[in-house]
């Protein structure tokens, strides 16, 4: 009976861990430090207004996707930005990873809009305008186009 109580307590304690620990996600990569990049971009582009966000590497799938590649996501309700761990490689330029992180951070500050058909639009004109302000925007777009196949099967 005492043993069952201990297991129950462990389950309860586990659910209180921060989200990235619950999911087994890492902040530090082999080549890039996401927290350092987030802090740098937050200061430079957002006046340190993005507070309480966690930035983590997502889970690495065994196989790369066949048709499309998601570089990053933001889960605003939990304030978690996930970056695809396939980007933590030596051949990925730092400025490209900064661009991906900047893109996800923009989602936290530029509001979504509802379209006429009732669907949500996250890449609004305002979002796209602000995204183009990123110093390496054109270079990052070109690099993505030229290197996307490296991330697909």
Please identify what each model-predicted range represents.
Residues 1-99, 108-153:
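Active-site-proximal or metal-binding-adjacent scaffold patches in catalytic folds
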């Amino acid at each position: 009976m005492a043993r069952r109580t201990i297991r129950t307590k462990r389950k309860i304690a586990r659910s209180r861990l921060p989200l990235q620990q619950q999911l087994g996600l890492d902040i530090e990569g082999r080549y890039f430090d996401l927290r350092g990049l987030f802090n740098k971009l937050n200061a430079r582009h957002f006046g340190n207004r993005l507070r309480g966000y966690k930035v983590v590497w997502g889970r690495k799938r065994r196989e790369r996707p066949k048709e499309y590649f998601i570089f990053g996501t933001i889960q605003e309700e939990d304030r978690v930005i996930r970056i695809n761990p396939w980007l933590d490689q030596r051949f990925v330029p730092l400025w490209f990873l900064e661009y991906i992180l900047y893109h996800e951070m923009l989602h936290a500050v530029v509001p979504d809009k509802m379209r006429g058909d009732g669907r949500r639009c996250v890449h609004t004109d305002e979002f796209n305008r602000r995204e183009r302000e990123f110093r390496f925007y054109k270079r990052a777009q070109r690099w993505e186009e030229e290197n996307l196949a490296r991330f697909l099967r």
